[in-house]
């Protein structure tokens, strides 16, 4: 069986915690897109683990697979694996041979392009980790894949063309000096580094044909959880373009990015992860955005700082047009609503129920950023709820939530016509109300 976990908003919804929550029923956790630009935090055995690439299930002894839809920075991968081993874990990680590899010049180009965009006030706010440039090389059919690392002759030929082309862009288009990048455009240095990566991948038997590997695990009766990074409104096709990531976090890509067929993924559950309010890192419209004391309160209570970048996140009220769009684009069979505890003790909790633009009421996300930027939120207000003990609520169940918090949850369920499987009532894995396990 498969369960696909998808962020319903702009990332940072708490996907890793939900993956961890159902980890006991899972045998394999698969990342099907993205790279080391999407941090996730998992708490297990009283220990906190912050990961940006390795699938979160490995901290509970599950197999973690980075699918062909991912872009992999081997340096980050091995740093995270080694750090987990130093803490007494034995992570079982597999890499799709078809996944593309982030190389040093990708990171340099990422920073150069963002700097150029800053001059025209059109920067995206990337993490600078080379994700976009690597996907560009994938789509341009010139990138290096994990399988290429294992073929020394093919690797050298590919690098000869690729590095020369990228150096020309870095210097002639962006006006930077490649010689000042500590070897990021040095073919010999990159080739040697890639061969070292290949030796470790080969020695630890990490590379697999991911689709075949996962199909065999499912045939053997194993449960597979497919984990998207970022969120629906950051999807390259369905998100707030151009303020998006360079891949597809939406559920449809779970098949493409893992090598499993769409009927295999579609027969399983698709769970949308929702933060009880909204947060965003980087640029782009945000109609329900807050500032001042309320924003600061939510930011501090929710710890709204990027796992990877440490940047303060922008925060706002829950945006229902965004969630309706996500529910349609992904086909959620269930949802999880996290961080209900963060909103406790506010006198009033608001929701962006709809938008208004040019006198028209809009209930879903506009297709263009320009139209979205012109939207004003139509707010719906809820009475706030008192603080509660997360452990008590998690133990007693849904009925122990304050009545006003229940009304808030039931409003979201009704608007999306989707049941809430999980309610996050505190920061820990155990501080959750589980109403339905998608694997059962």
UniProtKB/Swiss-Prot annotation:
Location in or out of the cell: Cytoplasm
Pathway: Purine metabolism; AMP biosynthesis via de novo pathway; AMP from IMP: step 1/2
Residues annotated as binding Mg(2+): 12, 39
SUPFAM superfamilies: P-loop containing nucleoside triphosphate hydrolases
Alphabetized UniProt keyword annotations: Cytoplasm, GTP-binding, Ligase, Magnesium, Metal-binding, Nucleotide-binding, Purine biosynthesis
CC cofactor note: Binds 1 Mg(2+) ion per subunit.
UniProt-listed PANTHER family: ADENYLOSUCCINATE SYNTHETASE (PTHR11846:SF0)
Name under which the protein is recorded: Adenylosuccinate synthetase
Organism taxonomic ancestry: Archaea, Methanobacteriati, Methanobacteriota, Stenosarchaea group, Halobacteria
């Amino acid at each position: 069986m498969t369960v696909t976990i998808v962020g319903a908003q702009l990332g940072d919804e708490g996907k890793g915690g939900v993956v961890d929550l159902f980890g006991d029923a899972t045998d394999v956790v698969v990342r099907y897109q993205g790279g080391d630009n999407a941090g996730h935090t998992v708490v297990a055995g009283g220990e906190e683990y912050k990961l940006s690439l390795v699938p979160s299930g490995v901290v509970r002894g599950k197999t973690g697979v980075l699918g062909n839809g991912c872009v992999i920075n081997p340096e980050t991968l091995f740093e995270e694996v080694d750090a987990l081993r130093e803490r007494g874990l034995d992570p079982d990680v597999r890499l799709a041979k078809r996944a593309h590899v982030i190389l040093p010049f990708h990171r340099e180009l990422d920073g150069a392009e963002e700097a150029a965009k800053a001059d025209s006030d059109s920067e995206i706010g990337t993490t600078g980790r080379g994700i976009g440039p690597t996907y560009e090389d994938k789509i341009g059919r010139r990138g290096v894949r994990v399988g290429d690392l294992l073929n020394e002759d093919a690797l050298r030929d590919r690098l000869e063309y690729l590095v020369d082309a990228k150096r020309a862009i870095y210097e002639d288009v962006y006006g930077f000096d490649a010689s000042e990048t500590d070897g990021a455009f040095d073919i010999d240095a990159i080739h040697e580094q890639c061969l070292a990566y290949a030796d470790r991948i080969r020695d630890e038997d990490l590379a697999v044909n991911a689709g075949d590997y996962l199909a065999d695990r499912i045939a053997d009766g194993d449960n597979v959880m497919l984990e998207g990074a970022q969120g629906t409104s950051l999807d390259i096709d369905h998100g707030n373009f151009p303020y998006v990531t360079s891949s597809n976090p939406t559920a449809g890509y779970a098949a493409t990015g893992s090598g499993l067929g769409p009927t295999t993924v579609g027969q399983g559950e698709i769970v949308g992860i929702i933060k009880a309010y909204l947060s965003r890192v980087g640029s782009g419209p945000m109609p329900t955005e807050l500032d001042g004391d309320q924003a600061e309160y939510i930011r501090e209570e929710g710890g709204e700082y990027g796992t990877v970048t440490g940047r303060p996140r922008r925060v706002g009220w829950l945006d229902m047009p965004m969630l309706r769009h996500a529910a349609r684009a992904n086909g959620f069979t269930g949802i999880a609503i996290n961080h209900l505890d963060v909103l406790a003790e506010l006198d009033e909790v608001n929701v962006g129920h709809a938008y208004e633009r040019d006198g028209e009421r809009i209930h879903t996300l506009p297709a263009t950023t320009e139209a979205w930027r012109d939207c004003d939120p139509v707010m719906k207000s809820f009475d706030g709820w008192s603080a509660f003990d997360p452990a008590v609520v998690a133990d007693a169940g849904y009925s122990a939530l304050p009545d006003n918090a229940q009304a808030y949850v039931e409003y979201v369920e009704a608007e999306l016509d989707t049941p809430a499987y999980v309610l996050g009532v505190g920061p820990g894995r155990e501080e959750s109300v589980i109403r339905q396990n998608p694997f059962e």
